[in-house]
Amino acid sequence: MRKVCRVTINDQVFSAFRGDLLLEAAHREGVDIPHDCNSGDCGMCRIRVLDGLAIGGEGRRPGTVLACETRIMSDLDLRIDTLPRVQTVSGEISAIRRRGCDVVEVKIEPTDPLMYLPGQFLRVQFRGYPSRCYNPTVPMDDEFPELDDLHLQVRQWDGGRVSPTIGSEIRVGHKVRMKGPFGSAFLRPRSESRLVLVCASTGFAPVWSIAVAAVRENPDREIVLVAGARSLKSLYMVNALCMLARFPKVTIVPVVETPQRVPDVIRVGGVTDHIPQLSAQDSVHVCGPLALVTAVTHIAAEAGAPCYCVPFQSRSGEREALEGGQARAVGRAPEWRGGGQQRARAS
């Protein structure tokens, strides 16, 4: 007979057999662990191991495992973050705005409230099209004054089934269904550590949401934001970066990959070439292409810094299935709503 193990998750206790998958054992006993993909891609079932032995499914951060892939090998004491509940909400597009040569911002009015944490993502389906994953974010200027609506930054991929049709077939009034939130790369509240944010292209969407929430919670928190783009015309988030730059403890590092004549404040080269020296006291968030996420994760690990990441690409490599932020500074701070849960409110 297999050994019976005692498993504690926060304040819930249940029994499981040695060798059981943690996620399956928990759900069998009526203990809820937030999850989505069941394949280790989304990171939503990441859980901290305080005591005991669990094998497999090691998370990117030391001391964490993915419940869908790890097996119980002894008594366990585990902790999991309290997250907004996953729900399905309908809505419709109320505005579309061109943000750059290949980026559009989509404003969605939900029919019911939708709570999420800055940095989480949603599965979004425009009626008649396949679903895609996007990070809800906050507006970058005053063109979209209703901050309780959902805002998506979408890169339009040549040959894509969904993104190229936004603004033509997918227009204002188009019906939308959203499920979420998912993901564990969200801003941890009440932290005093330096916040290092790294992104490329529409990876800026979750990073912008995190940055706004962080400065609203603590305007004196030290933040470094490194934002990359292929060229100057692709650096669509310049106005938002200028908003953040007004805060004295915020350092903005815009980077373009292609060598060209640019203003002195913009760096040229790879994004990782301009990441500040990290330490174990930093908190790092990265969103962008898989190569960038992998590189930043490695740099953070060498420094002993926690790194929360959202690659654009899943392990299957289906680029457009994750074509949003997931794959995946002149400001008026008093108007920003961040810190803790964001709420998309019914109109």
Can you say where each PLM-predicted feature lies in the sequence?
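FNR/FR-type flavoprotein reductase catalytic core
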Residues: L147, D158-S347
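Residue-level "contact hotspot" at macromolecular interaction interfaces
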Residues: S15, D36, M115, S168-R171, ...
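Ferredoxin-reductase
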Residues: T88-K175, S193, A229-S231, V255-P259
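Iron-sulfur (Fe-S) cluster-binding segments and ferredoxin-like electron-carrier domains
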Residues: V7-T8, F14, E24-P34, G43-R85
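Short conserved beta-strand and strand-loop elements enriched in small hydrophobics
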Residues: R6, L78-I80, L122-R127, H174-G180
